[in-house]
Amino acid sequence: MKKTVHLRITGHVQGVGLRYSVYQKATSLGITGYAENLYDGSVEVVAEGDEESIKELIHFIKTGLRWARVDNVEERWLEYKGQYKDFRIY
């Protein structure tokens, strides 16, 4: 089933390649959306795609980022809208 999730990632997550790593993983999983640095030092990710693929992306964010220190990942699941054609970094 297709879903959309809004993530807010906190910790030492800017300037360490997190957005690019998320971009690579999301693209490999067929997920669309974006990753963006926020002014408070966190990273926002919006991901659309297969629910299981999104769960795999979230697991990767929590455990697979070598240079980042992820303290928390807030998840807000939303109805799938198909707003994005690809995955982008802002």
UniProtKB/Swiss-Prot annotation:
<dbReference type="InterPro" id="IPR020456">
    <property type="entry name" value="Acylphosphatase"/>
</dbReference>
<feature type="active site">
    <location>
        <position position="37"/>
    </location>
</feature>
<dbReference type="Pfam" id="PF00708">
    <property type="entry name" value="Acylphosphatase"/>
</dbReference>
<feature type="domain" description="Acylphosphatase-like">
    <location>
        <begin position="4"/>
        <end position="90"/>
    </location>
</feature>
<keyword id="KW-0378">Hydrolase</keyword>
<dbReference type="GO" id="GO:0003998">
    <property type="term" value="F:acylphosphatase activity"/>
</dbReference>
<dbReference type="InterPro" id="IPR036046">
    <property type="entry name" value="Acylphosphatase-like_dom_sf"/>
</dbReference>
<feature type="active site">
    <location>
        <position position="19"/>
    </location>
</feature>
<protein>
    <recommendedName>
        <fullName>Acylphosphatase</fullName>
        <ecNumber>3.6.1.7</ecNumber>
    </recommendedName>
</protein>
<comment type="similarity">
    <text>Belongs to the acylphosphatase family.</text>
</comment>
<dbReference type="InterPro" id="IPR001792">
    <property type="entry name" value="Acylphosphatase-like_dom"/>
</dbReference>
